[in-house]
Amino acid sequence: MEEKYNRNRIYIKPDEQEKIKHFRVLLGGAGIGSIIAECALRMGFETITIIDGDKVEESNLNRQNYRLEDIGNYKAESLAKRLLSINPRANIRVINEFVTHDNVEKLIERHDIAINALDFKSDIPFVFDKICSEKNITVLHPYNFGWAGFLAVVDPDGKPLQGLSGKPLGFELKVAEYVLGYQAFWMQPQEWLEKVVKQYQREDVTLPPPQLSVASWITAGLCTHAMFNIATGKDVKKFPKFYLSSLLL
């Protein structure tokens, strides 16, 4: 095992370390994806494609993997620069484009797993999942619930996340409502999240959901662990089941 991964020993076998090194990760969206990318890289995922046409804004700095000096620069480029400063030998591919109907199929090709961290401003996140399913690619859906990290793993042959709502506007809220209903059914109500959802529902529907750095890092850990399990043939929970992690649970 390479020296930089020496502390992974016991948890990760040498052959598993080699597998994840070449496991091709597609990162659709470099918001919460920016935290996931670094967590994955540090564990040994060295083949990552970053797709995002957005640029860094000051409001991103409370929860995303950027610095003041990155403001105004492309997120994908800034993130790649940071990742390569950690591991210069990593295979980091940068695409400074938004995912569209015209390019989505080409972008998804030749990857082993996809992270759908795209903004729900159009139906593109749904199209992204559909094409991944057609290409037999598992999709990870990470969400930032402030004090809690959420991850849904969508199997190519399983139930699509789009089943929660066919409308992109307010989709994050639908996911939160689904979590609340699921937890209540299993006698694990999340009153803190209910309060957040009710307050957010009173805001302008066009406002993005509030998010904290806490959940960004929790979710990054969930995603990286799930990718490791998938890459090495271990089990993961598939949607409609999900992962939810917080001190408040």
Give the predicted meaning of each segment:
Residues 32-33:
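Hydrophobic/small residue at the entry helix of a nucleotide-binding pocket
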Residues 113-214, 248:
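E1/E1-like adenylate-forming module used to activate ubiquitin-like modifiers
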Residues 47-87:
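Glycine-rich phosphate-binding loop and adjoining beta1-alpha1-beta2 segment
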Residues 1-26, 58:
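N-terminal charged helix/coil linker that caps or initiates catalytic domains
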Residues 211-231:
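Mid-domain beta-loop-alpha active-site segment that forms a flexible
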